[in-house]
C-alpha cells in the first residue's frame, strides 16, 4: 500500500504539484487534469491495487491531493459482518424501541429552544 501526498499550487494559470517528502511531481492547466496526472504518476511508483484519492483546496491558489494505492479498503459498503450467530434476534427487536426513545427525546429538546428544525 502506498500513500502519496502532494502539495498543489496555482501560478500563472497552471497548477503544479510536488510530492510531500518525495520526488514525484506533475503540472497541468486545471485541477481535474492535475489529479488525473498525479494518480498516473502514483500508479507508476506503486501499482499494488485499487486507488482512492482526495483533493482539498486550502486557498484559491493552493491545495492538497492525496492518492492511496492498494490497501483493499475501498468504498463505504462492506459485506463483512453480514452473517451473524443465532440468538441475536431479541437484541435486534429491542434496538428499534431504543431508537424511538432517542427520537422522542431529540424532538423534546427541539421544543425547548422554541423552534422546529424540520417544520
UniProtKB/Swiss-Prot annotation:
Keywords: Phosphoprotein, Ribonucleoprotein, Ribosomal protein. Coiled coil: none annotated. Residues 96-105 have a biased composition (Basic and acidic residues). Phosphorylated. InterPro entries: Ribosomal_P1/P2 (IPR027534), RPP3 (IPR044252). GO terms for biological process: translational elongation. The keyword Nuclease does not apply. It holds the Pfam family Ribosomal_60s. Signal peptide: none annotated. One of its GO terms (cellular component) is cytosol. Residues 79-90 have a biased composition (Gly residues). GO terms for molecular function: structural constituent of ribosome. Disulfide bonds: none annotated. Belongs to the eukaryotic ribosomal protein P1/P2 family. PANTHER family: 60S ACIDIC RIBOSOMAL PROTEIN P3-1-RELATED, LARGE RIBOSOMAL SUBUNIT PROTEIN P3Y-RELATED. Plays an important role in the elongation step of protein synthesis. This is Large ribosomal subunit protein P3z.
